[in-house]
Curated annotation (Swiss-Prot):
Signal peptide: none annotated. This is UDP-glycosyltransferase 88B1. The lineage of its organism: Eukaryota, Viridiplantae, Streptophyta, Embryophyta, Tracheophyta. It comes from Stevia rebaudiana (Stevia). PANTHER family: GLYCOSYLTRANSFERASE, ISOFLAVONE 7-O-GLUCOSYLTRANSFERASE. Belongs to the UDP-glycosyltransferase family. Pfam families: UDPGT. The gene is UGT88B1. May glycosylate diterpenes or flavonols in leaves. Its EC number is 2.4.1.-. It comes from the Eukaryota.
Length: 461
């Protein structure tokens, strides 16, 4: 008998890959007859290494197979812009993906192909093979409202976002100031803007869009999507909110990891955790402001510091990038670690009471699940939009004062960290959402119901 397969196709980069792997685990857990193949694009631009993560998943999760696509040299006239490459590279790989899907189809039944939105180019391939094709939107329902509304925004607003200085009205979400739109969309005639619009149009024609969120977290956005109000000039695709999908922190040894050992010695809910994602780096001037603000706040802290961009490839020391004597002066109350920390395990630790975050959606969901209130410090991509949702709509984060170019003063860090750790409103709200997040993925919960609606056609053919 032919085996049944679900094909997942993420874009390069650890953030999108982790979400896809968690989706693969969910599919197999509830439908053991379905095995999962993840197509892996070579990282031809800097996305953060995925090798260790893939090796770990391969060892612990045998029902997920990683199929590494061969390296194809980039044409000499390729764009040097990251966002253009993110769309152009999948286009380059379409012939390889076509042959791969045909080869898999010879020995297995492909029940579904699930695409990351950056690999939109593959939509024409899977549809040409008459395969049910879905998009996995790694952000939330509010972000999906904005994304599906992009073609309408394109027609409605004549100027570029960078020049508008106005609020963009999007059904289902609070008004978004034009300066808070992703910078890759600032120029409506740019390749990146046009690629996002193409992807949005293809999403509307797909078998469905899967989003990593849950109904109770984003009720207004979810209702807008289900009512078809995000797309104004055609039918809307089925929407499936199946989250929260997050990596668990259970695989980290609390007695071996430096961060967790230190947290074990701290009082309950006393530590503010600062971490800014795999691509979140600051210049030395900003690192020093954060350090001064933390020290003045008097709060306990665990801070992940990445190498400043000006330091090139050389190794760096904390004393080289932080104020003189800072690490020594704060060692009783704080721990600074370089480059990486086990974020889900830290957010799930009893001692952590606050999170200064870049507003990446995976990180935001982890904070919601573990009930840790946030300070919103967006850095890139759609994170400024996420800040609006998290602060104004969902009310689980605090706004952080920053200059027009994104610089944050020591005073703003001190003030907002204190407000976060001493305040009750946001803490109570996120604890309420944490309870609802857990209920959503239990039997009969909203996300579980959506998930079985999604997979029903895959298992009854």
């Amino acid at each position: 008998m032919e085996s049944s397969k679900v094909i997942l196709y993420p874009s390069p980069g650890i953030g999108h890959l982790v979400s896809m792997v968690e989706l693969g685990k969910l599919i197999h857990t509830h439908h053991p007859s379905l095995s999962v193949i993840i197509l892996v694009l070579p990282a031809t631009y800097e996305t953060g290494s995925t090798t260790t993560y893939i090796n770990t998943v391969s060892t612990t999760t045998p029902f997920i197979t990683f199929h590494h696509l061969p390296v194809i040299p980039l044409p000499p006239d390729s764009s040097s812009e990251f966002i253009d490459l993110a769309f152009d590279i999948p286009q380059l790989y379409n012939p390889v993906v076509y042959n791969t899907l045909v080869a898999i189809s010879e020995t297995s039944t492909i029940k579904a192909v699930i695409l990351d939105f950056f690999v939109n180019a593959a939509f024409q391939i899977s549809k040409s093979l008459d395969l049910p094709t879905y998009y996995f939107f790694t952000s939330g329902a509010s972000g999906l409202c904005a994304f599906l509304h992009l073609p309408t925004i394109y027609k409605t607003y004549s100027g570029n976002f960078k020049d508008l200085d106005t609020f963009i009205n999007i059904p289902g979400v609070p008004p978004i100031h034009s300066s808070d739109m992703p910078t890759v969309l600032f120029d409506k005639e740019s390749n990146s803007y046009k690629n996002f619009v193409k992807t949005s149009n293809n999403m509307a024609k797909s078998s469905g869009v899967i989003a990593n969120s849950f109904l109770q977290l984003e009720e207004r956005a979810a209702q807008t999507l289900r009512d078809g109000k995000s797309i104004t000039d055609g039918p809307s695709p089925p929407i499936y909110l199946i989250g929260p999908l997050i990596a668990s922190g259970n695989q980290v040894d609390h007695n071996e990891n430096e961060c967790l050992k230190w947290l074990n010695t701290q009082p309950s809910k006393s530590v503010v955790f600062l971490c800014f994602g795999s691509q979140g780096v600051f210049k030395k001037e900003q690192l020093k402001e954060i350090a001064v603000g933390l020290e003045r706040s008097g709060q306990r802290f665990l801070w992940v510091v990445r190498k400043p961009p000006s330091d090139g490839g050389k190794e760096f020391g904390l004393d080289d990038v932080l104020p003189e004597g800072f690490v020594a002066r704060t060692k009783e109350k704080g721990l600074v670690v370089k480059n990486w920390a086990p974020q889900p395990a830290i957010l799930g630790h009893e001692s952590v009471g606050g999170f200064v975050s870049h507003c990446g959606w995976n990180s935001s969901l982890e904070a919601v699940v573990f009930g840790v209130p946030m300070v919103a410090w967006p850095l890139y991509a759609e994170q400024k939009m996420n800040r609006v949702y998290l602060v104004e709509e969902i009310k689980v984060a605090l706004w952080l004062r920053m200059s027009a170019d994104g610089f944050v003063s020591a005073e703003a860090v001190e003030e907002t960290v204190r407000q976060l750790m001493d305040g009750r409103r946001v803490r109570e709200r996120i604890l309420e959402m944490s309870t609802k997040a857990k209920a959503a993925v239990e039997d009969g919960g909203s996300s579980r119901v959506d998930f079985f609606k999604l997979t029903e056609s895959w298992t009854h053919k």
